[in-house]
Regions:
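Structural preference for long, well-ordered alpha-helical segments in enzyme cores
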Residues: 16, 29, 70, 74, ...
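Short, conserved micro-motifs composed of acidic
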Residues: 44-45, 93, 103-106, 118-155
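Basic, alpha-helical interaction scaffolds
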Residues: 81, 148-220
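Short, residue-level hotspots on alpha-helical faces of the histone-fold
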Residues: 31, 68-72, 207-215
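Conserved pre-catalytic core of RNA-dependent polymerases
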Residues: 1-57, 91-92
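Inter-domain linker/hinge segments that demarcate the starts of reverse transcriptase
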Residues: 98-116, 182
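Short, conserved non-catalytic motifs in the polymerase core
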Residues: 4, 40-66, 90-94, 153, ...
Length: 222
């Protein structure tokens, strides 16, 4: 949600022009996004009204599309996985001192600065996988840095709900989803005790538990 709040309207205006949007459509979209008033209401208390000078309203169909338009030109000479405000960059190298990925990180920072966005350092991780003979150790690979600060190196990381481990096994992911499903089984138990119908129990099971166990199963169930 934070990323949606940081959409720079001036950067968006440039994107509209770069992609050849009709002037009328560009003006209409910018008018929809700009000068929006907002306030917070809790019970009978209402905060002062503030005007938003950036961002896109959430809960609208236009919001996600506007954000995708903003990040559409974010690309590198490396495989890049983008999903809304999540970006993963992948590099394969035979030399542990290869600087390709570090250059991609620098390009990402430069792109973010030009487009009025900022990278969340707390959520930015480095996952290094050594394979094919394991002639090198992870410690042989220089750490990636952002502004002179090292990016945290982890042994596993969750990408779109799937935990990828350094050893290329799915043990951690399987333990994670089994634990998550077991916690939700308690809900089923309580519903059965309350006398809910079997059909409703099955529907809730499929929605809350089976969906967790089957999510991306073609990837990790191998």
């Amino acid at each position: 949600s934070k990323a949606f709040e940081l959409i720079d309207h001036n950067a968006l205006r440039r994107k509209f022009n770069d992609y050849g949007f009709p002037p009328q459509l560009s003006l209409w979209m910018l008018a929809f996004l700009s000068r929006r008033n907002q306030f917070v209401k809790v019970g009978g208390c209402v905060s002062a009204v503030m005007r938003s000078h950036a961002g896109a309203p959430q809960g609208t169909r236009a919001g996600p599309n506007v954000f995708k338009l903003l990040i559409n030109d974010l690309s590198f000479q490396l495989p890049t996985i983008k999903y809304v405000d999540d970006v993963s960059v992948v590099s394969v190298a035979s030399d542990p001192n290869d600087q390709t990925l570090q250059k991609a990180v620098a390009s990402l920072i430069d792109w973010s600065n030009r487009n009025g966005l900022r990278m969340n350092n707390d959520k930015t991780k480095e996952l290094t996988i050594i394979y094919f003979g394991r002639r090198h150790l992870v410690s042989d690979v220089p750490e990636l840095t952002v502004g002179g600060i090292s990016i945290e190196r982890v042994c596993s990381f969750k990408v779109l709900g799937v935990i990828i481990s350094q050893d290329l096994t799915w043990k951690e992911h399987v333990l994670y989803i089994v634990s998550k499903a077991c916690k939700r089984l308690f809900i089923i138990y309580q519903l059965i005790r309350s006398g809910i119908s079997v059909a409703d129990v099955i529907a809730i099971y499929c929605s809350l538990i089976r969906s967790v166990l089957e999510y991306c199963s073609p990837v990790w169930h191998c």
